[in-house]
Amino acid sequence: MKKILLAIFTILLMVSCNKTTVVSVEEFATKAGDLVDQTVIVEGVAKHICSNSGRKLFLSTPGKEQLVTVFTGEGMEPFDRTTTGKTYKVTGKVAITVTIDEAYLNEWEQEVRESGLKEGTHICETEQQAAGIDLKENLDENPQMQQIKAYREKIAQNGGKPIVQYHVECSEYEIIN
């Protein structure tokens, strides 16, 4: 009897340790901080797949603003760019992408100033939407400086709290349609 109870306890412990949480795209924005290092399943429509590497996918819910950033895991092939608009079911661990505070912005700003204006620097609009910032079209200002300014405004709106961005490190996915 003791062996049976021990076996049941061991199985329950293993199952609870490997718990996978299902979250919607909208829930991810508010729950990601509590889910760091945990495995999640997120289902959403591929709004954009990075055109440079194909290793970054942005999931959305049609008609909603929220986005979830998904990176391919180690050893995975890039996402297929022709699947933009398809529904993905992604499994992976939640991780912190970056913590943006005043020190981070000061360092970034110094790097931009030292490197000079970068003609033709492209800022991915989808990435900015995922970060929750809105860049105003200003052709006279360096796009990176616009981005820094927008982050400072967002930090001020948050009462000085840093901006923490999260992503899902994909371990597997399926395309549903």
Regions found by a protein language model. Give the residues of each.
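Sec-dependent bacterial lipoprotein signal peptides
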Residues: 1-15
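OB-fold and OB-like single-stranded nucleic-acid-recognition modules
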Residues: 17-177
